[in-house]
Amino acid sequence: MFQEKSEKSSFPKRSSSLRSPSDSPAITSKNVFMFVNYSKDWPLILVGILLMGGSAIATLMNTYIYGEIMGKLSQFYLQDQSNHSFSQDIVKLCVGLIGIGCCKMILVWLGMFTWLKFGEIQQSRARMQIYNKIINESQSWYDSKQNLIGQLTQINRCIEELRSCNGEILASLMQTIVLILALLIMSFYQSWSTTLIIMASFPIMALCGWYFGKLTYKAQQDENEVTSKASKVFNWCYVNPEMVRFFNSKNIELTKFKQLIEKSAQFYYKLSHAVAANTAVLKTLTLMMFVQGFWFGNYLLSHKTITINQLFTCFSSCLMLGQAVSGITELLAILNTGHAAADKISGFLLQPPSKAKLLLLHSKYPPFEIGSIYFKNVWFESNSQNSVAILQDVSFGILQNQFNYVIGKSGSGKSTIAKLLMRLYSVSRGTIEIDTVSIDKLDPKYICQNITLLEQNPVIFDDKTIAENIAIAIVDDYDSLQAIPYYLIEQSAHFALLSDLDLNMKVNHLTLSGGQQQRISIARAYLKNSPVLIMDESFSALDTETKQGLIEKVKKWRIGKTTIFITHEYKNILDDENVIILDQGMIKNQGQFKKMKNEEIVQNYKSQGIETSSYETTSQSFSDNTKLPDGDYNYKTNPYILKDLESQIKEDTDNEKLMGVLAILRYCSSTINGKSLLGFGILLAIFQGVSSPVFSYCFSKLLSTSLDSSIGLNSTQKILQWSCISLSIAIFTGVTSYLSEFILNYCGENWIVSLRQLTFFKLNNQDLSFFTGFDTNWSSSEITALLMNDTRDLRNLISQFFPLLANLVSMTLIGIIWSIVSGWKLALVGISFVPLVLLVTVLYGKILESIENKYKCKVNNVELDLYRTITTIRTIKIFNIQQYFETVFKEDLKVLNSIGVYRALQTGIGFAISDLFSSIGQAIILFYGMKLISQFQYNYSQLLQVITLLSFTISNASILIHQLPEITRGQRAGTFIVKLLKDITSTMEVNDSCGVSSVRKRNSKSGSDSIGTIGPVKDNQLFKKVTTDNDTLAISFNNVSFSYPNKLPYILQLKSISLDVKKFTTIGIVGQSGSGKSTILKILFRLYDIKISPDSNTTKKYHDQTVKIFNQNLYLINSGLLCQTIAIVPQFPKFFSGTIYDNLTYGINNTNSAGSNSSSSVSDSEIIKILKLVNLHQFIVSLPQGLLTIMNDSDNDNDNGNENENENENGNTISTSSSTSFTFSGGQLQLLAIARALLRNPKILLLDECTSNLDPITTKIIINVIKSLHGKLTILFVTHDKELMRIADNLIVMKDGQIVEQGDFQQLISNDGEFTKITKTII
């Protein structure tokens, strides 16, 4: 924990250097070697080459010994060697085989470990460079990114592919290259003419490898690009679930997501076709080499120009050479996917830096604190080709050591002043001078240490406690968060009226109100205590009493220090304090406040008496006197217990037991489409597996003909016969290889497409409690990576596990049975190795399950660090805490590297053991077979047949180990997908054209139940039409009680509410914080189900509660019809990165909804009419792009990366550029939100604090809009605005979840009740 009672000065300050030196080289290429630092990596590369090269030489020595054994056999039959001498020589040669196998195992193990470690190093450098770019880029760079989260989700996958290519793929490539060179030398030495004949097909192999590799590279690039777009859509819906529900855009997003992943699948099918065709051609050509090699070899034997030893050695070398060439082309095809991944990474890293970042290279750090601040002829324009001036020739001074106020209506440029002063953006023209030095020449660290900006919507770090969220403001001054004296944090918390400092935000951050978050932000500022403080609407979410108290405390604290207030409230401005008035980006007036009182904006404020505060929205307050009732205590809210729970969750995740492959496939069986096609693919894989022992039988016959030739027998007829059979089998193997591989890859991709669609659909149909509950363990980055990246590994369960299993079973059974029939004595010796191989494979698989899961969990931690940095980047820059976040990232990366080294050790041994088993098995089989020959129990034809069958069987069984890492990664992905699907509640909302045909109970413990499917909802009641003609009541609540599900502690927000709202009336809801006002609006929009309750007793007690819209049950109305009936304007409206037009019409043109109006679209004239109504038409027309102007994500002050495709409702891409984006003010966004709601032509309009945080002029516009709508539709608003209360037909006063008063404004104000108490605090 934090250190107690220590002096701040006793702790050393960190170095002022933000960046630590990196061993990563500059990016000069776009291939898998782009992060290799040869000056540092050469020892590792050299050792890796020597080890894998040594293992290749060991393979060559095996080939030589095989040739010697065949030579000894030929001499024995020619009676050139005695029985005793023959047996002794065979023993020596077989012992040599075992010795070479042991050496090769050690070399492969160490070599694989070396290259896997090398791959981990490249991965670390890639992640570090990505992180350095992210944390060093300017805010304008972030604003220009249209798909940052989607891009980085895909880049994370590309980094893993880069690691794999620099690890096991490069190891196999080095081994294969050395093996090819050695085999060429060996084969040419034995018989150059035979070698040339056998190598005749090599040019064709090389040409096929080049052509199909080119296709693979292009298809992989396209798949990566489209997948990143799909990731963006998914992330938007997961981070902004309420937006998707407000505007009935579930089908729009689902359709868009389906189109993208189906397009991605098409590219994968092309990739699979290229890889399968390449593999098939190479397999066919390699097998054909047998025919041409033996034909020519037998010719040489018959003419006595070559010995049997030379022929076998040459032929074995060429055979292995052909397999090596085939293998290297397959490796190069995989390497091409790595090059495509590297191209994606380099494309991101090589993006040009912003102008602001380039200026940092020449900045300086003055030795004194900030004094005078002057803006001189400052212009700031939007980041667009047809730029819009946000500030125009602005010149003013900030009075040093005094209080300064920047006021003006929304969109006048007030917040831009603060962002320019913090160097989040650079001025377009003019200068900002601090003590006569241009701000562009000052080090950003100097700016951040001397100036603190508190924004209206502060960021709360959800992985930290309240204390850590406060302490992070000065973490740069200490070695760590824990080194900060705790009493300093307590003092800051006390200043900001905060308690419960150990409360864990991982569980509770979603329950914080805006006011509570702002108090944490104020505590940070107090702790930092910088010379200059900028407060940008930093009190706007506080209730009046708390706000007034904190303002007084801040002004007392800041006496004698430069303080800048950006505000819409003027009652706390003293007559002699400095005020700057902005209007349309220009200075309208500046001077003492007493000289400004005749300004229009000040007069508007005085005449309306507006108080634009927004009360805190939850009953939990962190003020010192706040206590939970004893009866509501829940042990899960204890901060220390929560820490234990969090660590336990993390530990459980790391040690998650993986499901079996068959268990995963059984659970997900409903999503596996085309089972007949899958069965056909498996059957083809079995045929391919059967072809191997059949070909090995033909191979034994060809060997026999060679021995016949070596002892002088005529074998021309046999050679012709078995050569033709071998050619037929080679072609059959190639055809079945292509068809089985492509079909199974197709089925695997088709499966994950279905899984992605189903998961997206089910997540999109959860109520809001799934996304905001305390037991929601899925972060946005984690679930996006799982669904979009890890499912690529999941398809291995079909594309690799099934053919592997089919091949293993078919080859093993047929090989064993055939060998027993051919010669049971020798066969039984060979068969004894098969159980051992399978046992070791199973044990190795279990070990891999554990290490792969731990490794992937650490990868997720590193990716989560990157995601957190992106989503909180502005706060990180404002408080200059980049070094802290970089340290956290490096520590997690270090942990990942250590797990990666351990994983490399365990993975490497799998490759090594298979070679050892093959060598020992073949040596013992050869020894015992030769013994049977020497005892004349077997003839050489029978011997070769059994040895060949057993050798193929044992070798192929050993290869299973090589496939285990990929299958294990697929197992992990499948386990977590199943876990996600089980976590998704079955309380599905009624969707438009989609429903769930089978659902499960919440928290079902059965692992074998159906996961549901996407299909039509059959209950016609769900499509009930909303009619309003004969109903006088628009809204009716009957005995409604409600508690937010999955939130701690369980407290009823509504208690037996009964409420009737007549048609065409305007109703206001008022009350203190936590009284349940906004909860009513959320229930009306069906964001939560009132039937869901934390315990069954509560559910039974309130089973008769109902909510009706125009006398129809709210929960039986189709969501499309509901969104046509009700529109909502939230307190903090959100917009995606798209055009103004797309944002205004988002969800309107959703014509796929069952029961919805197919003609529900809006015309340009309707848009113009609504924009004029909300007083925005003239402003939007003044923009260079008009309605096609792109809105920045930063417009929302939203750091969650909620981006969306720039496509219209028909899925057509709108041609836009990030250079045409524009940033809107809070007031403009609020007016756009009202316009967006009115364009839906609703019958009921809900407004939640629609005038909070706005200037008097914008507030007046909104009030006039509401007045103009009176009598045309039913309006229900939540407010603390006195002027807005006056225009309501009826006011509903709430307290502690109950309605305590009703009536119009004048009636309630004269009753001296709860309403009077509320209005007194406002007035």
UniProtKB/Swiss-Prot annotation:
Ranges annotated as biased composition (Acidic residues): 1194-1208
Catalytic activity annotation: an [alpha-factor](in) + ATP + H2O = an [alpha-factor](out) + ADP + phosphate + H(+)
Stretches that traverse the bilayer: 42-62, 93-113, 169-189, 192-212, 281-301, 315-335, 677-697, 724-744, 801-821, 828-848, 909-929, 941-961, 1120-1140, 1170-1190
InterPro entries: AAA+_ATPase (IPR003593), ABC1_TM_dom (IPR011527), ABC1_TM_sf (IPR036640), ABC_transporter-like_ATP-bd (IPR003439), ABC_transporter-like_CS (IPR017871), P-loop_NTPase (IPR027417), Type_1_exporter (IPR039421)
Glycosylated residues in this chain: 37, 83, 136, 450, 714, 777, 789, 939, 991, 1030, 1039, 1097, 1143, 1149, 1157, 1192
EC number: 7.4.2.7
GO MF assignments: ABC-type oligopeptide transporter activity; ATP binding; ATP hydrolysis activity
Subcellular location(s) of the protein: Membrane
Positions that bind ATP 1: 408-415
Signal peptide: none
Pfam families, A to Z: ABC_membrane, ABC_tran
A Gene Ontology BP annotation from the UniProt entry: oligopeptide export from mitochondrion
Disordered: annotated segments: 1-23, 1194-1217
Biased composition (Low complexity): 12-23
Domain of life: Eukaryota
Keywords: ATP-binding, Glycoprotein, Membrane, Nucleotide-binding, Repeat, Translocase, Transmembrane, Transmembrane helix, Transport
Membrane topology type: Multi-pass membrane protein
The keyword ATP-binding appears for this protein: yes
Domain ABC transmembrane type-1: 45-337, 678-969
GO cellular component, one term: mitochondrial inner membrane
SMART domains in the record: AAA (SM00382)
Binding site for ATP 2: 1071-1078
Family affiliation: Belongs to the ABC transporter superfamily. Alpha-factor sex pheromone exporter (TC 3.A.1.206) family.
Name of the featured protein: Alpha-factor-transporting ATPase
Organism the protein comes from: Candida albicans (strain WO-1) (Yeast)
Gene name, Swiss-Prot/TrEMBL: HST6
